[in-house]
């Protein structure tokens, strides 16, 4: 077991390697213990934290917005349509999707479930994480998970009630009058819940399979450290001469004086001893070819347990093609979670007043393939595919920002009139004359042959 370094911290927190193995044998029963272990390891293990953040931060969450259940065959009330669109873009502006979801995704990839309660004013929006031990998934509405809250949480914590809001105050009063009302559903319009492991009903840590590997890394670090100390340790044996009967041939006091002198000049990693016997050396060090870096191997195995390429985190040797395939497989996992985010946001957008509802789609872009996706959209645009909003979104300009920037640049600042590019082959109109400057323009005389060429337009057919 781990005996030094992080191992001491693990033991103090009662999360040993043996505990994790035991929890994994029955993850449903031990869901709480696995979640708490995952939270703690996220804080103390750089490898685990990087893997969680790798999945949580992979997608920039760029999105486009368009009408929901739009019927182009019916006459559109332009004023009502614009009013509904304005409400939707205003909502997405205060939502701040990328920031709120970055926090939510980090928690979800670490704990499997993120359950939050929405606090919204006219100009602000915030999703508060609910304590994981006091929420459970109770139903599904419009494809979104809906949770119930355990109001026994506030027993002895009544001072926190006001910060949670009126719904919690009212339902806690219900619980105090009737203890059977411990679990109560929260207003579905104020909930936001994500679950990474959608294939199981109970909380299952998405990266649970690699938790044991964290301890293996620490074990091998300790072994490597011990081996390194051993390789650098030397011992000097002072053999005292003896006669055939074993009696010392020199005075022991004199031998001790030489021993003391030697110990005073030797460094800490060199030991000195006296012996009347021959000393035989036993070397436990293996050759470099036979002694692979076990710590490196443990780190590589850790990433293999997760299912991601260790090359992403500075180890292992793979080809660019295999790395790209590995990232693509990881992207598929994160894109699936994006669909949950879409459904939650669209459920909230449906609650807005207005004759026309709007919805969003999060583009399947990752930080690793952003440029390829952007180039693909530009090619699609050449064939008339309506991707202008997607092109803007792919570079981080979402719909509310795009509307504002179009007005600022074109109508207010009139940049298209004031920012005049230098003349070049890209900016000249097709009717402009091309070719090098004429002889007259260069201040030179025209030769007879050039004059004849101009008169007969001999270069026209070239």
Task: Please annotate each region the language model reported.
Residues 98-115, 253-261, 283-390:
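C-terminal amphipathic alpha-helical
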Residues 12, 22-25, 29-32, 36, ...:
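Conserved aromatic-histidine-acidic binding/catalytic patches
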Residues 11-40, 167-190, 261-267, 271:
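An N-terminal domain-start capping segment
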Residues 27, 55-68, 95, 108, ...:
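Generic structural signal for hydrophobic core residues of well-folded globular domains
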Residues 256-261, 265-266, 325-329, 333, ...:
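C-terminal anchoring/interaction modules
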Residues 181-319, 358-369:
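Extended, charged amphipathic alpha-helical segments
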